[in-house]
């Protein structure tokens, strides 16, 4: 019987914390993507070596809106999102795995941007247009 079970990688935050990385900031694990990309690649490789079939990009807490608030221009924002893909690709190549590992974009909910814990209850104090525009900006 063929095994159709596929494994998604695990948390970015836990391995970062184990490595001593301070996640107490607005970008959470995205801070490591910007300031310590080699550590992100190392974590991806660890998940590949553990059997992951899918790697999530390290962009859950990163959004166009948060980066704009930090004064980052559109070109740099695109570079940050591209870097998350490139690191996952490099981890796959460097691991020399024979598996066909897929990369999945990790895009956090609108509520994670709001910083009010509403992602845990799903009650957003926002309009549909605000939520729509938030996600469109991230996808562009």
Task: Please provide the spans of the model-predicted regions.
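Domain-level signal for soluble alpha/beta catalytic cores
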Residues: 1-140
């Amino acid at each position: 019987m063929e095994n159709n079970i596929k494994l998604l990688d695990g948390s970015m935050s836990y391995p970062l914390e184990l490595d001593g990385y301070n996640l107490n900031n607005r970008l959470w694990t995205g801070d490591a993507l910007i300031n310590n990309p080699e550590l992100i690649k190392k974590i991806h490789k660890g998940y590949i070596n553990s059997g992951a079939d899918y790697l999530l990009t390290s962009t859950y807490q990163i959004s166009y809106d948060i980066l704009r608030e930090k004064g980052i221009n559109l070109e740099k924002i695109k570079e940050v999102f591209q870097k998350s893909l490139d690191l996952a690709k490099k981890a796959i190549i460097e691991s020399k795995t024979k598996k066909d590992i897929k990369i999945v974009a990790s895009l956090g909910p609108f509520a994670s941007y709001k910083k009010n814990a509403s992602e845990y209850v799903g009650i957003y104090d926002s309009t549909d247009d605000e939520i729509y525009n938030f996600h469109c900006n991230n996808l562009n």
